[in-house]
Amino acid sequence: MNPEHSPLGKATVYAAQYDASLLFPIPRAGAREQLGITSALPFFGTDIWNAYELSWLNARGKPQIAVATFYVPAESPNIVESKSFKLYLGSFAQTTFDSIDAVRDTLKRDVSAACGATVSVQLVSPHDFGKLEMEELDGLSLDRLDLDTDVYEPDPSLLKAAEDEAPVEETLVSDLLRSNCPVTGQPDWGSVQIHYVGPQIDHAGLLRYIISFRNHTGFHEQCVERIFLDILHACKPVKLAVYARYTRRGGLDINPFRTNYNQPMPDNARNARQ
């Protein structure tokens, strides 16, 4: 489905009852073809969605709430357009469910069907809210660098690496990632963590490259995949992982993770801006 046909940027009608048809899938293939991905994926990973505005009614009509986390595999053929996801979750508000397990099962079934792959779902109920973590991405901050730049569209030529020197292992972070929704033009603000093993990447060039997304239009997942591929091609690391955490919009935050080697799933801990 084309993003222009999604609910984004259109007048909103909120459903009075649960409605799975509100979910609007968008194929990943189109954006990936623009990146030169036409066959096997050069990465694997997950899109972590956190939903903070989930509520339903119990059998006695009393509202219930939970924080939901969805783990969408990167190999799924579709993503779900975020406003449609918000409207879908909103449709639970006046619908009765017998238990939190019934809510979880319904979410898993519907979102998996929309994405075309098995999506894991976790629900945190209010008595466990205190266990939800908040921390910043670990790594050496690129934002400490004092530099000039005037490039605000993605430019991989900014990426340089010391290919003639011994390989290094580094984890680098920046809070200066910004891209824009391709349908509404609204800015998406994010933090990004880059872990790699290989020729040392020039820090100033990498920060300028991250800043260069500032006027770019693309969904969160597409931007992270572009960052991953540009670094992979320009700097030739042996191992590479890119993890971004975007600020919340419409009660949802989206946190894509891409890697080319086996490693544990990153922590799903909110940062200060989320």
Curated annotation (Swiss-Prot):
Q: Which residues bind NADPH?
A: 82-83, 249-250
Q: Which reaction does it catalyse?
A: 7-aminomethyl-7-carbaguanine + 2 NADP(+) = 7-cyano-7-deazaguanine + 2 NADPH + 3 H(+)
Per the UniProt record, one Pfam family is QueF
Q: Residues that bind substrate, according to the entry?
A: 80-82, 220-221
Q: Where in the cell is it found?
A: Cytoplasm
Stored InterPro entries: GTP-CH-I_C/QueF, NADPH_dep_7-cyano-7-deazaG_red, QueF, QueF_N, QueF_type2
A single Gene Ontology MF term assigned here is: preQ1 synthase activity
Presence of the UniProt keyword Oxidoreductase in the record? yes
The lineage's top-level taxon is Bacteria
Asked whether the UniProt record includes NADP among its keywords, one would answer: yes
An example GO CC term for this entry is: cytoplasm
List the active site: 181, 188
Which keywords appear in this protein's UniProt record, sorted alphabetically? Answer: Cytoplasm, NADP, Oxidoreductase, Queuosine biosynthesis
Q: In which pathway does it act?
A: tRNA modification; tRNA-queuosine biosynthesis
This protein's major location comes to cytoplasm
GO process annotations (BP):
queuosine biosynthetic process; tRNA modification
For this protein, the Enzyme Commission number is 1.7.1.13
HAMAP family for this protein: QueF_type2
Q: How does it assemble?
A: Homodimer.
Q: What does this protein do?
A: Catalyzes the NADPH-dependent reduction of 7-cyano-7-deazaguanine (preQ0) to 7-aminomethyl-7-deazaguanine (preQ1).
By its UniProt entry, which PANTHER family does this protein fall under?
NADPH-DEPENDENT 7-CYANO-7-DEAZAGUANINE REDUCTASE
What is this protein's record name?
Answer: NADPH-dependent 7-cyano-7-deazaguanine reductase
User: Which organism was this protein described from?
Assistant: Burkholderia lata (strain ATCC 17760 / DSM 23089 / LMG 22485 / NCIMB 9086 / R18194 / 383)
Upper classification of the organism:
Bacteria, Pseudomonadati, Pseudomonadota, Betaproteobacteria, Burkholderiales
